Amino acid sequence: MKKTKCLFDEEKQTPAGMVSVSQLQSFMSCSKKWEYGYVENLTPRVERPYLSIGKLCHKGMQVVMQCAWKNQRTETPMSKTEVLRSALYAIDCDWEKYMEENTFLDEEIPDQEKMLEDAKSVFEQAFHEFDIDKYEVVTVYKDGRPLPALELHFVVPCAGSKGLHGYIDAILKDKNTGFTWCTDYKFRKALSPDEEEAYNIQNAVYCWACHKMGIDITGTMTWQHTNTPATDPQVLKNGAMSRAKIKTTWEHYAECCVRAGLDPADYEEEMKEKLADNEFYRPTYEYRNLETVKRIWNDAVVPASYAVKAAYKKNNRRSMYPWNCKMCQYQSICQAELRGYDAQAIRDREYVVRQHRQLTEEDTADVVSKI
């Protein structure tokens, strides 16, 4: 019976006593911040959960690649149009569920509807840029049952803890090159420089996880896309389309011309070149060989795991410097404790105890079958 090693077993395992990359990163940045978040399990109190464009687009990518995996295993594959429709439907469903589970004032609803509209616009653009036909989804096996390597929950042995667990967005094989990439989707306001990928400990850990699962990968691909939709060009008073350079694509500009009853050919020569350097997405590749991954694991991850274990039994230091503290979600408690204020009152007023993520069988099921 085929069985992929190191897959998290939801029926037999819980994250209790395990560590995650986010936990280790929190500890390495400030052990007091880690204590607030992982010992006290505090998270800022909010009126309602926050649904972002990034979360909705991530759902869309998950469904798209599930369709791609299903296409690999059937004689009647879905067309790209059907795949896109399925993904947009899943985005709609997530948004509708969010709206049903939370209370909104009437005047707040248009903002939420605009967010959905923007998310679908961003995702549809990303769908065409990603090119799902380029990749094959790697198949893993759980108790002999084939599963796509998508939203893959793993747990690998990690000294100092009961294991390190995490979720891999996708493991994809490039059909042209044969390279296999541990893939992470990022929808963000601004694209990060490629140079930062060398310091991405999350992706290095995911490489180690793939190695322990017995999956040979070439490296990691962080596929990042802006989370703002392409801008619509302005129709001038004389009925012509503005030729100003804006943050949009030529394809979107041409579509706006058609909607306005204009011929895109009249604008193509000038505008196609003018808009060519607008960057909406970038795949960032990092080729990590196994020796590099081992060194990162042994020199950074394992020591942090041991330090986390020890930190449960001691008073943790505060890493006080502006860049760290101004971005910290626990700064109000930290400052209250340092100044002798009523920190417990702030805990009760501004924070709640976090509920840990529980992955259900429905989460791991092929959502395409439900569409």
List the predicted regions and their residue ranges:
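RecB-family 4Fe-4S metal-dependent nuclease core
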Residues: 1-371
